[in-house]
């Protein structure tokens, strides 16, 4: 089948009321941006839908990119043709014959009459086209109106006809750039890239901050995080990566504070630095990959202590998810194989033998009085390295 158009289906955007056009226009822009590496495409809105003209491009390659755009729940390859009812029926027959060759046994026709001057109603169109198809291939396939293996969808519009069948699922969500911007604390593990992706799926642009302890952690570990940011950029567009060396902070904690509190104290510094960066970059929230009880610092008491040093909302989309579910998403979005490459991070290098699991905020705050917090924070901020990551 020679497809010449994609029908883009969106979900939540359809119930946005008076603001719907804002989301639609952003979605169109995001689709165009996603397709730039392939070519220049005509992406437009018509009859309350979004379409992509395929021209001579490989439809499978284009669909694979379009389905990554947040806000899209499905993409349908279709054939758009001149406004002629007999032509519509011939295209429907050709499409059904391909489905028969692929092994399908039952079908149903669904029709939409966009041109009200046409002599048949939508239901009458379905019956007529279905009868025509049965007369041609009824010995090889049966009708099943309740649970068909194949749906042949036919539309008779004011200026053209259209036939399509398959729907390739998208990721849903809202168009990137419609819900502000967030700063993600991006490590090299499995969780934080998934958390970043999930928040971006709700329409937030994302930047990332990565904490390292070079030379105690290797340059390879930083390259690994860049690779993860590059994968995320496939979905999120450009990702600005802020690389922060907190070695001096960790040394100060080790010299002046209780060993068991080192992880919580380090996390509090990370949150402070992330908030400072967020204020500078006009980010509205922080993102972390934390999940209740997954590690010692992620108990409810630990999260309370880390939250206490920031004013921005902290989004933790993985908070109640099982590890297996997080891994499934990581595999789906393509970050898993990179995340499991063994490299030490700044937390594991200075991990205490017996970290405190139920820290008390007042005790942690008292421990911090031994540190010059403002100087330590400002010193590392002054040395931040910034890189824009694009796919």
Swiss-Prot record:
The chain positions of domain THUMP read: 60-167
According to its UniProt entry, the protein's GO biological process terms are:
thiamine biosynthetic process; thiamine diphosphate biosynthetic process; thiazole biosynthetic process; tRNA 4-thiouridine biosynthesis
Instruction: Report any Pfam family annotated for this entry.
Output: THUMP
* Domain of life of the source: Bacteria
Q: Which family does it belong to?
A: Belongs to the ThiI family.
- One GO CC term, this protein: cytosol
List, in alphabetical order, the Gene Ontology terms for molecular function in this entry: ATP binding; CCA tRNA nucleotidyltransferase activity; tRNA binding; tRNA-uracil-4 sulfurtransferase activity
Q: What does this protein do?
A: Catalyzes the ATP-dependent transfer of a sulfur to tRNA to produce 4-thiouridine in position 8 of tRNAs, which functions as a near-UV photosensor. Also catalyzes the transfer of sulfur to the sulfur carrier protein ThiS, forming ThiS-thiocarboxylate. This is a step in the synthesis of thiazole, in the thiamine biosynthesis pathway. The sulfur is donated as persulfide by IscS.
Q: CDD domains of this UniProt entry?
A: PPase_ThiI (cd01712), THUMP_ThiI (cd11716)
Q: Which organism is it from?
A: Clostridioides difficile (strain 630) (Peptoclostridium difficile)
| Record-linked Gene3D superfamilies | 3.30.2130.30, HUPs (3.40.50.620)
Alphabetical list of PROSITE patterns matching this protein: THUMP
What protein name is recorded for this chain? Answer: Probable tRNA sulfurtransferase
List the EC numbers from the record: 2.8.1.4
Question: Is tRNA-binding included in the keywords of this UniProt record?
Answer: yes
Q: Where ATP is bound, by residue?
A: 185-186, 210-211, 267, 289, 298
Pathway it acts in?
Cofactor biosynthesis; thiamine diphosphate biosynthesis
* Coiled-coil positions: none
Q: Which reaction does it catalyse?
A: [ThiI sulfur-carrier protein]-S-sulfanyl-L-cysteine + a uridine in tRNA + 2 reduced [2Fe-2S]-[ferredoxin] + ATP + H(+) = [ThiI sulfur-carrier protein]-L-cysteine + a 4-thiouridine in tRNA + 2 oxidized [2Fe-2S]-[ferredoxin] + AMP + diphosphate; [ThiS sulfur-carrier protein]-C-terminal Gly-Gly-AMP + S-sulfanyl-L-cysteinyl-[cysteine desulfurase] + AH2 = [ThiS sulfur-carrier protein]-C-terminal-Gly-aminoethanethioate + L-cysteinyl-[cysteine desulfurase] + A + AMP + 2 H(+)
State whether keyword rRNA processing applies.
no
What NCBIfam families does the entry give?
tRNA uracil 4-sulfurtransferase ThiI
Q: Please give the InterPro entries that the UniProt record associates with this protein.
A: Rossmann-like_a/b/a_fold, ThiI_AANH, ThiI_fer, ThiI_N, THUMP_dom, THUMP_ThiI, tRNA_STrfase, tRNA_sulfurtransferase_ThiI
UniProt keywords (A-Z) are: ATP-binding, Cytoplasm, Nucleotide-binding, RNA-binding, Thiamine biosynthesis, Transferase, tRNA-binding
Where is the protein situated, by its record's location annotation? Cytoplasm
């Amino acid at each position: 089948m020679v497809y010449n158009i994609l029908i883009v289906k969106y979900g939540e955007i359809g119930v946005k009321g008076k603001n719907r056009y804002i989301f639609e226009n952003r979605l169109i822009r995001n689709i165009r941006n996603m397709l730039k590496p392939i070519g220049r495409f005509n992406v437009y809105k018509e009859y309350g839908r979004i379409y992509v003209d395929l021209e001579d491009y490989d439809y499978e390659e284009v669909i694979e990119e379009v389905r990554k755009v947040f806000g899209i729940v499905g993409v349908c390859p279709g054939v758009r043709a001149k406004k002629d009812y007999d032509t519509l029926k011939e295209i429907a027959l050709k499409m059904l014959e391909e489905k028969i060759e692929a092994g399908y046994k039952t079908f149903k026709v669904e029709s939409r009459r966009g041109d009200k001057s046409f002599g048949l109603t939508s239901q009458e169109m379905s019956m007529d086209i279905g009868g025509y198809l049965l007369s041609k291939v009824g010995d090889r396939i049966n009708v099943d109106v309740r649970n068909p293996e194949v749906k042949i969808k036919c539309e008779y519009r004011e200026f053209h006809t259209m036939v399509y069948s398959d729907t390739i699922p998208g990721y849903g969500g809202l168009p990137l750039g419609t819900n502000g911007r967030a700063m993600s604390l991006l490590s090299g593990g499995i969780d934080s890239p998934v958390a970043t992706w999930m928040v971006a799926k709700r329409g937030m642009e994302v930047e990332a901050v990565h904490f390292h302890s070079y030379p105690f952690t290797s340059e390879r570990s930083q390259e690994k995080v860049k690779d993860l940011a590059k994968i995320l950029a496939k979905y999120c567009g450009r990702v600005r990566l802020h690389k922060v060396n907190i070695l001096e902070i960790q040394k100060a904690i080790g010299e002046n504070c209780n060993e068991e509190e080192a992880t919580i104290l380090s996390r509090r510094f990370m949150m402070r630095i992330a908030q400072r960066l967020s204020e500078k970059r006009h980010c509205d929230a922080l993102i972390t990959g934390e999940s209740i009880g997954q590690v010692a610092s992620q108990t409810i008491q630990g999260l309370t202590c880390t939250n206490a040093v920031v004013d921005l909302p902290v989004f933790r989309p993985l908070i109640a998810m099982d590890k297996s579910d997080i891994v499934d998403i990581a595999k789906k979005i393509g970050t898993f194989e990179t995340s499991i490459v063994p490299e030490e991070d700044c937390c594991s290098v200075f991990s205490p033998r017996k970290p405190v699991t139920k820290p008390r905020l007042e005790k942690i705050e008292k421990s911090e009085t031994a540190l010059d917090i403002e100087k330590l924070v400002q010193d590392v901020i002054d040395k931040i390295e910034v890189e824009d990551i694009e796919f």
